[in-house]
Amino acid sequence: MAGRPHPYDGNSSDPENWDRKLHSRPRKLYKHSSTSSRIAKGGVDHTKMSLHGASGGHERSRDRRRSSDRSRDSSHERTESQLTPCIRNVTSPTRQHHVEREKDHSSSRPSSPRPQKASPNGSISSAGNSSRNSSQSSSDGSCKTAGEMVFVYENAKEGARNIRTSERVTLIVDNTRFVVDPSIFTAQPNTMLGRMFGSGREHNFTRPNEKGEYEVAEGIGSTVFRAILDYYKTGIIRCPDGISIPELREACDYLCISFEYSTIKCRDLSALMHELSNDGARRQFEFYLEEMILPLMVASAQSGERECHIVVLTDDDVVDWDEEYPPQMGEEYSQIIYSTKLYRFFKYIENRDVAKSVLKERGLKKIRLGIEGYPTYKEKVKKRPGGRPEVIYNYVQRPFIRMSWEKEEGKSRHVDFQCVKSKSITNLAAAAADIPQDQLVVMHPTPQVDELDILPIHPPSGNSDLDPDAQNPTL
């Protein structure tokens, strides 16, 4: 009895038993009552695994020490070899219990898929997707299925309550499908899409294809159309990277969306300002055309002219020509507009291009816009002996406009008075030979009186070589 080791009692306070057990089994980690209560609560399987881990912990810790960093301290490795098996055996059943619990819970779930949930900005993401795909689809409003891009757009004001009951239409733009709630289009009735899915569907003007999809916006890229769809949701179009402002402007004009600073946001401010300047220049020139240019055109037309040459001077320019020695370049036929604002308008090449396009749209022809020298006043006169005096004028560079409204400008103005059938015949006699006989007037020559008296009535049948003045031998 004395040689057999005493069983360990967790509640015992005998110091001899504590020292004896501590020295006889240094690798065993003893537990207090709190630990034993947890082990008892874990069950029989928990106790068996703990004992197994305690008995074989030395071999496993030795293998683990070989694969670990050998630069550690030996005492730290010894402590790790003592603690690791117990920690592993305590935590492993708990993890296994949670895994088994999750498996049982998943097996008890119904096999039907989780219903779809809507993201805050209106996109629909499936519950079976990964978290990365779900976050991407919720932020972009898109999802990729079967190798093609499908973008889902809906009215965010409807809320998640009406998602399943609201209508969906599929738009095909540049081989890309957009699933859209048509109510976002009807909120903008002045746009093309608003008319298509508003009054157009009511009057059966907008019809889908055989698959029930609508092919719209021909010639517009999917990236541009995706940015334009944001206008129906937020009222702002953000120009995507790699898309030029003229391309976005063309798409907005096609879809009847106003291209304004309040609706367009982009990083290239120079291109945006250029487009806005073109719009402003068009409106401004249409005003100048009606108020300043058209009255001068009417004055030229009333005088019988079919073209007009207008020079734009500033308000400070003074034209003082000498009546005796006027300019010799035909400036007297030019119309003059005194307007500093119009002068500043035509100073830019872009504005002149806009003005030329407006005049073409109004049906005018032979349009020329530029800057030329215009004489204002006489500087001096150079008199040459025996010749005409030379007048020197002061010239200023000012814009000019030249236009025509002549209808027959393509025909030749040459008047041909030669009565010939062909341009290759220059001889009048040869040309007259081709005149029909019924148009000819035959004029027979009348005989003269002195010839009737001299010529005999019966001319002799003799030799015709006889001299008529010779005396007849028979007489």
From Swiss-Prot:
GO terms for biological process: positive regulation of phosphatidylinositol 3-kinase/protein kinase B signal transduction; positive regulation of phosphorylation; type B pancreatic cell proliferation. Keywords: Cytoplasm, Nucleus. InterPro entries: BTB/POZ_dom, BTBD10/KCTD20, BTBD10/KCTD20_BTB/POZ, SKP1/BTB/POZ_sf. Residues 81-94 have a biased composition (Polar residues). Disulfide bonds: none annotated. Residues 1-143, 456-475 are annotated as: Disordered. Residues 22-31 have a biased composition (Basic residues). One of its GO terms (cellular component) is cytoplasm. Residues 167-241 form the BTB domain. The keyword Glycosyltransferase does not apply. Residues 146-475 are annotated as: Interaction with AKT family members. Residues 108-142 have a biased composition (Low complexity). It comes from the Eukaryota. The keyword Ion transport does not apply. Residues 57-80, 97-107 have a biased composition (Basic and acidic residues). CDD domains: BTB_POZ_BTBD10_GMRP1 (cd18385). It is found in: Nucleus; Cytoplasm. SUPFAM superfamilies: POZ domain (SSF54695). Interacts (via C-terminal 330-amino-acid region) with AKT1; AKT2 and AKT3. Interacts with PPP2CA and PPP1CA. Plays a major role as an activator of AKT family members by inhibiting PPP2CA-mediated dephosphorylation, thereby keeping AKTs activated. Plays a role in preventing motor neuronal death and in accelerating the growth of pancreatic beta cells. This is BTB/POZ domain-containing protein 10. The gene is BTBD10.
